[in-house]
UniProtKB/Swiss-Prot annotation:
The name this protein goes by in its record: Putative septation protein SpoVG 1
Gene: spoVG1
Intrachain S-S bonds: none
UniProtKB keywords: Cell cycle, Cell division, Septation
SUPFAM superfamilies, alphabetized: SpoVG-like (SSF160537)
Gene3D superfamilies with a match to the protein in the record: Stage V sporulation protein G (3.30.1120.40)
Single biological process term from Gene Ontology: sporulation resulting in formation of a cellular spore
Reported function: Could be involved in septation.
Keyword Cell cycle: yes
Organism (species): Listeria monocytogenes serovar 1/2a (strain ATCC BAA-679 / EGD-e)
Length: 102
């Protein structure tokens, strides 16, 4: 199984949720509403879930082994970190690379 695409949208809230993501598996299957949560021990990925009538949350889709969970978490958190980097201003980068020779 390969994660072939990760789409991530940051959310600005006062809560612990930092982003919502969708992943594509093997270019054939998409899972939406994967959340990036800021937990007590750092960022982690929460799979999509729904609330049952008794108030409990149940995963809609989830990996069945730790290796697959690790792949999903690594891919989503890598996309989150890239989204956190400031954009590079191409004009200032070009100006800095010009060296005057006298």
């Amino acid at each position: 199984m390969e994660i072939t695409d990760v789409r991530l949208r940051r959310v600005e809230t006062d809560g612990r949720m930092k982003a919502i993501s969708s992943i594509t598996i093997d270019g054939e299957f998409v899972i939406h509403d994967i959340r990036v949560i800021d937990g007590n021990e750092g960022l982690f990925v929460a799979m999509p879930s729904k609330r049952t009538p008794d108030g409990e949350f149940r995963d809609i889709a989830h990996p069945i082994n730790s290796g697959t969970r690790a792949k999903i978490q690594e891919a989503v958190l890598a996309a989150y970190e890239v989204a956190d980097e400031p954009a590079v201003n191409e004009e200032s980068s070009a100006d800095e690379s010009i060296v005057e020779e006298n």
